[in-house]
From Swiss-Prot:
It comes from the Eukaryota. Component of SCF(ASK-cullin-F-box) E3 ubiquitin ligase complexes, which may mediate the ubiquitination and subsequent proteasomal degradation of target proteins. SMART domains: FBOX (SM00256). CDD domains: F-box_AtFBW1-like. It is found in: Nucleus. Kelch repeats lie at residues 104-154, 163-215. The keyword Ion transport does not apply. Residues 1-47 form the F-box domain. Pathway: Protein modification; protein ubiquitination. This is F-box/kelch-repeat protein At3g16740.
Length: 391
């Protein structure tokens, strides 16, 4: 009897190219021959072409997204109108024993930048190929670091991926010492370099940047001067804007206007629409209405906004404000529906991870994603398209 592992290469390729992305880990562990074939450039192109075609066929109803839940990273299939959220599988692990806890993820071009739970390690990961690159710090990493993953597109077939790491904070160590560090890691040269930046803006450490077309955008606010020791003031209102880091020019762009004005305790979070447009969610702490806008034009130096994409009064639906530190979301532009990930805020202990699906005319659904044993672990979501890029 002929074993499947003994099939001719062309027939083996045809069979394996039909296997879902989340099953590739099992393929690689089946035998050495399949492991070698799965990493072949011609095979990966064929496999990804088939995966994208299948995903496109399903996109009338479903999306594939990455979610980070309980310090683990999973691939989900999401139907916002049915509604249903199905865990397709855990993405290829960062290590065989799967003992790596992840606290933050950043997605760009099929790659994930992952920050470990203990803040001590940084890794770039291609979930499709299973490749990883552990990044050693120039000096050290810090709990208040902000990160971004982006790329410089040298031509249509060549992208130079880079990581931006920065912090600009005062440590409460009696000396009120300012730590200001801006540096870029180049994956091609495997090296860090310092970038000279004197910001007149602040990005809170819990605000994740959003990668779009190789650049990263943040919600930012006016920088406040340090206060004399012992003096405390309450500030609820300050200038707010969108800020972009251009990975080609390796510099921050000008302040870009938002379609609203927010206060300190309001919820503001960013998302992307098919890696072409930027979406922003805004919910004031003083009101119950959630509003979402989608950009008409978005570049490092310019942005224009469409009219409100979605406005939903949450008072009768949930009665609470989405978390300013943790809520993340994505939208189905055609169906005019959005999904917001947060905790079960009907419970005092926030013991469940919940997807809140909202739409026009009061459309509202809740999907329970399972137990949340660590209330401080935010559930993150981002759209995902597999990539064969080598790291």
């Amino acid at each position: 009897m002929v074993q499947i592992s003994d099939l001719p290469r062309d027939l083996t390729e045809e069979v394996l190219s039909r296997i879902p992305v989340t099953s590739m880990r099992a393929v690689r562990f089946t035998c050495k021959k399949w492991n070698t074939l799965s990493k072949d450039r011609s095979f990966t192109k064929k496999h990804l072409r088939g995966a994208r075609a299948a995903a496109k066929k399903k996109q009338t109803k479903e999306f594939q997204v990455i979610m980070m839940i309980q310090f683990r990273v999973y691939l989900y299939s999401v139907n916002l109108l049915n509604p249903s959220i199905e865990r397709i599988g855990k993405l290829i692990s960062l290590d065989v024993e799967d003992h790596v806890d992840i606290s933050k993820i950043f997605h760009c071009g099929g790659l994930l930048l992952c920050i470990t739970k203990d803040i001590s390690r940084l890794v770039v990961w291609n979930p499709y190929s299973g490749q990883t690159r552990w990044i050693k710090p120039r000096n050290s990493y810090h709990r208040l670091d902000r990160y971004a993953l982006g790329y410089e597109e040298k031509n249509k077939s060549c992208r130079c991926y880079k990581i931006l790491r920065f912090m600009d904070d005062y440590e409460d160590d009696r000396a009120l010492r300012l730590i200001r560090e801006f540096e870029i890691y180049d994956l091609n040269s495997d090296s860090w370099k310092v970038v000279n930046v004197t910001p007149d803006w602040d990005v809170e450490f819990y605000h994740r940047g959003l990668s779009l077309k190789g650049n990263t955008y943040w919600f930012a606010q006016e920088k406040l001067p340090p206060l004399p020791r012992g003096r405390v003031i309450t500030i609820s209102d300050m200038a707010d804007f969108l800020l972009c880091f251009d990975f080609t020019r390796e510099r921050f762009g000008p302040r870009l206007p938002l379609p609203f004005h927010s206060f300190v305790e309001d919820t503001v979070t960013l998302s992307s629409v098919r890696d072409k447009k930027l979406a922003v969610l805004f919910q004031p702490c003083s009101a119950s209405t959630v509003k979402i806008w989608i950009s008409r034009k978005i570049e490092p130096n310019a942005v224009s906004w469409r009219k409100v994409f979605l406005a939903v009064d949450m008072k009768s639906l949930t009665g609470f404000q989405f978390d300013i530190n943790a809520a993340s979301f994505f939208v189905d532009e055609k169906k005019k529906v959005a999904m917001v990930l947060d905790k079960d805020r009907f419970s005092y202990k926030f013991t469940r991870n919940i997807a809140y699906i909202i739409g026009k005319k009061g459309y509202f659904e809740k999907v329970d994603l399972g137990e949340s044993t660590v209330s401080s672990c935010a559930s993150l979501v981002c759209s995902y398209v597999p990539s064969s890029v080598q790291i």
